Each structure stands twice: as structure tokens, then as C-alpha cells.
Amino acid sequence: GRHLTNRQATSIIALLIGVLASLAAFSLHKLIALIQNLLTNDFVADSFNWLYLVFPVVGIWLTMLFIRYVVRDNISHGITRVLYAISTKQSKLKAHNCWTSLVASALTIGFGGSVGAEAPIVLTGSAIGSNLGRLFHMSNRQLMVLVGCGAAAAVAAIYKAPIAGLVFTLEVLMIDMNM
């Protein structure tokens, strides 16, 4: 039988990572909207509601409890963590990073916290790339490319801007995408 070349296998896995990272970005967007809707659905639009001042504090508190008692690991500094994983030439990110940053940021943003979705979704997409690549026993070089694919797909999906995802990966993460 005919076997796939390394380049073909990496391309197929990269496509799968792109789909999964895009689904993660979509899930984050929908989860934020769901939380916001649940919290503010009954509010009257033209009057002051003091809960707008309380919700961000509650969201940060819930996020802190989630990180301390469920995750039990530091999930902050998403982009810095990805850069560190790439710079060590290992490109290894923990499996829980495929979902924990997503849940924590959805809680914080959904409750009105003033944080962005970029760092958590970059960490999520990169972790998907890293863990799927390791599942298929890819080399460190291929893992680095797959981490970049996950980051690019996640940024492209969260901002609905495919070129921005690619530019982010090439410029900020400085990943050489040659296989």
C-alpha cells in the first residue's frame, strides 16, 4: 500500500487542528453570549442597573474558583506560554489548555470583565495543535508548525479574519511555517 509522506500527514493534521481551533473559537463566542444573555435578559435597557457593577466581580471570583479548584494550574499569560513552549523547541502545551482557558475567559468576559479573548483563544488553539501533534507522534519541528496552525486558526476564527490569523502567527509567534 501507499503511505502518506510527512508533509501530507502534517497537512491533514493541520486541517483537523484548524477545524477544532475554529470550533473552540465559535464555542467561546457562543458561551460568552449565553452567559451575558442569562445575566442581562430581564434588564430594562433605559434604566440604571447596579448589577452591571457586581457581575464583573462575581465573574472574576467564579473564574478564580474554577482555576483554583478545577484546573489547579496557572493558565494566565496565554501568548507568553505559547511563546515559551515554542522557544524551548518542544512546543508542548498541557492537554487541559485545550479547554480551561476557554471556560475561564468565557466566565470572565461573560460576566462583564474587561479582558480580551485573544490570549485565551491563542492558548486554546495552540494547545489543540500541540496535543493533537503529540497524539500522532509528530517531530518537534512538525509540532511547532501545528502549534502555529492552531494559533492562526483560533485568531482567524475569533476575529473572522483569516489573514490576521496567519500574520499573527508569523509576526507575533515568529513561527517558520516551512515543513
Model-derived regions, located:
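Alpha-helical transmembrane segments and immediately membrane-proximal extracytoplasmic
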Residues: 1-179
